Amino acid sequence: MEVNILAFIATALFILVPTAFLLIIYVKTISQSD
């Protein structure tokens, strides 16, 4: 079973980018509420 590197990278980006985006918004919201 071969692992398609491009598919792996695409999947990782598809998961990490929205997660990082949400984390940034979350941190900014917490900072503003203080």
UniProtKB/Swiss-Prot annotation:
Name where it's found: Plastid, Chloroplast thylakoid membrane
Query: Which regions span the lipid bilayer?
Result: 5-25
* Any one Gene Ontology cellular component term annotated for this protein: chloroplast thylakoid membrane
Topology class, membrane: Single-pass membrane protein
Keywords of the record: Chloroplast, Membrane, Photosynthesis, Photosystem II, Plastid, Reaction center, Thylakoid, Transmembrane, Transmembrane helix
Instruction: Give the record's GO biological process terms.
Output: photosynthesis, light reaction
Q: What does this protein do?
A: One of the components of the core complex of photosystem II (PSII). PSII is a light-driven water:plastoquinone oxidoreductase that uses light energy to abstract electrons from H(2)O, generating O(2) and a proton gradient subsequently used for ATP formation. It consists of a core antenna complex that captures photons, and an electron transfer chain that converts photonic excitation into a charge separation. This subunit is found at the monomer-monomer interface.
- Record family assignment: Belongs to the PsbM family.
User: What's the subunit arrangement here?
Assistant: PSII is composed of 1 copy each of membrane proteins PsbA, PsbB, PsbC, PsbD, PsbE, PsbF, PsbH, PsbI, PsbJ, PsbK, PsbL, PsbM, PsbT, PsbX, PsbY, PsbZ, Psb30/Ycf12, at least 3 peripheral proteins of the oxygen-evolving complex and a large number of cofactors. It forms dimeric complexes.
NCBIfam families per record:
PS_II_psbM
Q: What is this protein called?
A: Photosystem II reaction center protein M
Annotated source species? Cucumis sativus (Cucumber)
Q: What is the lineage of its organism?
A: Eukaryota, Viridiplantae, Streptophyta, Embryophyta, Tracheophyta
Q: Which gene encodes it?
A: psbM
